[in-house]
Structure formats: structure tokens, C-alpha cells
Amino acid sequence: IVPGKNCTACGACVQKCPKSCISMKEDENGFLFPQVDTDECIGCGLCDRVCHLNINMRNDETKMAFACTHSSDDVLKVVYGCAYVTPTEPHHIRVARKEDLKKLRGSKYVQSEIGNSYQQVLNDLKFRKWVLFTGTPCQVAGLKAFLGKPYDTLVTADIVCHGVPSAAYFRKYIEGYEKKHGCTVRSFDFRSKENNCGTYAGICNIDNNNRTLTRKIFYFNEYYYFYFLKSELFRDSCYDCHYTNLFRPGDFTLGDFWGIDGKKLGFNSVDGCSLVLLNTDKAKKIFKELNVCSSKVELAFAVANNAQLRESSRHTDFRKTLLREYRECSAEEIQSCFKRRYCIARIKARIKYAVPRKVKKILLKYRHLTK
């Protein structure tokens, strides 16, 4: 098994082990790592051979980039993706009904547990079912390593990923939020379209005194959200990611299309615009059959406006302080330190958020014209 900091917790080794002697355990900072029961291990080496970091996943096929908005209800037969199974625990789940696809929507700025999804995918593929698997690049790479060979009926889509904090860190934050507000969190969406599109504002649905309430979550008010955007909370492997480039493991790459405001696309992007990279011939063929509003853009433009297509996220020495706070402090204490530490930055963020979106679009358009 790949040691320590390089491990991405994709879980392929856990599902491949013929003796089921590998399990995922949290370390002192809440990150998941594989742990081997040496008494049960037979030394077969499958865990090493299935690790995507030990396999060349480089995809050299010619890429195409598109700006897109969704305009179709067409779906594949089975979809795998990340969903909250509790308000603090995102897991990969299998979806076979159209009405359940909504569970996979929304941004989840926390690492999901794969569980036995790879084995479920294999079972579906054996029955010749069409499968769409979505996840972070390392999860897609983990699936492909687990399968060991390509399948005609498998379609994969990796996301433009900044990095993943631990579920334990997120769980601690939610527990602190519940204690502070005297409520029970029912759902959490970091980037809700109920707020202004393109803003870092989420939605938290809570139960409070027998009432169900909806509260906006602003990154400048919450330590977890703020530190995520500063790239200080991720697992070690995220800062040396193998997939922050154009050699993607997925057939498709999906993400927000930053920097697209001011571009003439030929369709209305007021509700947001997605970046879609077509990484394989399979993706290009499927894309032609989809009912989406799209506009082809230069690949170089997409890369220039999405940093994680060029380089891994970076952290500062401050990350050590945040991990120490996680180990030693309560959520209330971490929140209090955050507010004192970033008082001025939070005021500036509030002012920036108060500027109407229409004004921002005019300024962005002017910036493009003056370049």
C-alpha cells in the first residue's frame, strides 16, 4: 500500500483485498487511511497492484473544452456519485431512479467515502448495464485501477477538484454549529443556487424548536468554509495531486467555468455555467448526443481560468495551526479564533458580497473589453 502522505483514500485496496483485512481508519487529524490486519494478511500483493498511484493513468487523447448549461433530463441507466447519507457524512451511492438523482446535486466540500461502490460498479458492468461514475480524479482513477480493464458501457466523469478536507473536520464544525444555534442540521449545501449564482454562499436547513428553517451560510462567517477556500484543510496528497493537469482519468471532466463572464456564448448563463472537458473519443461521441446548450471554447482559456487544471493547491505553515486546533480545541474555540484572526478580511468580503451581481458583470465585461 502506498505509504502515508501520498495516499488519496480512494479505497481500491480495501475492496480488492481477498481476505477483507484492510479497512479505512481516521488518523489524528481525521483523515482516512487504509489499515491492514497483519494477522489476516496473506501477502498476495493485490493492494499494491491495484493502487492507482502505482499505475500509469496518463490519458494522452486530444481534449476539447466546452461551456455548458443543462437542458436535458436524459440519464444513463445507473449513476454513482457523492451524496450525504447524514448531514455530515458524504458517501458514494448507487442511483438507478431518475427521481433520486437530486441526491447527487450540490457542492460537497468534504471527502466522500467510497464504501463498496467499485464492487457495485463491477457487478453492474457484468450485467452490461450502462454506468456513469462521477467523483474526484483519484476516485475515478481508483475505480479504473480496481476494474483492471476498460468496459464499453462505463462512462466516467472526474471533477475539477481543489482538494478534500476530512469528514471528521466537517463533522466537528457541524456539531459546533448545532450547539451554537441550538438546532439540528438536516442538510447542508455549500453552493446553493437559491443564493446569487457565482457566489460562495450556501444553504443550511435546520430544525429549531419544532420548526424547519433555512439559513444562508457565508464563507466569511464560518471557519470551515473560509479555511477550505484558503486551501488549508486538505489531506496531504491533495497538495501533490497527480491529476491537476490535462491528463485526466475520466472520460469527462466537469467543473465551474470561472472567468466565463463577459464571453459571448450564444446561450443564457445567468444561472451558472459549467466547464466540460471531453477527454476521450467515447466522451466526444456521447456529448454529440446530449441535449445541452454549449459553446466550444479554447482549451487554453479553460486552463487559464481554472487553476486546478494546471497545478495542485498550496497551503501555508498555518495549516499546522489549524490541524492542531482541530485536535485540541472545540468548534466554538476554533470559530472564535477565526473571527479574531480574520476580522479585516471578513469585513472586506462582506463589502464585496454586497455589490450587486449586475454591477459585477458590467465590471467584468469592461475588463474583457480593455484587455
What are these regions (language model features)?
Residues I1-G4, V36-D39, F220-L229:
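Short, intrinsically disordered, charge-biased short linear motifs at domain edges
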Residues D152-G176:
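Short, flexible loop segments at boundaries between secondary-structure elements
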Residues E178, C183-K371:
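Long, compositionally biased charged/polar accessory segments in the mid-to-C-terminal portions
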Residues T38-D124, A302-R324, C329-E333:
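Flanking helices and flexible, charged tails adjoining ferredoxin-like Fe-S electron-transfer domains
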Residues K5-K19, D39-N54, T136-G142, L233-L246:
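Local cysteine-cluster metal-coordination motifs and their immediate loop/turn environment
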Residues D73, T86-T88, F133-L143, G163:
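Gly/Ser/Thr-rich loops at beta-strand to alpha-helix junctions
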Residues A12-P34, G202-Y223:
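Short, charged low-complexity linear segments at domain edges
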Residues I1, N6, A12-N29, F33, ...:
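Iron-sulfur cluster-binding cysteine motifs and their immediate structural context
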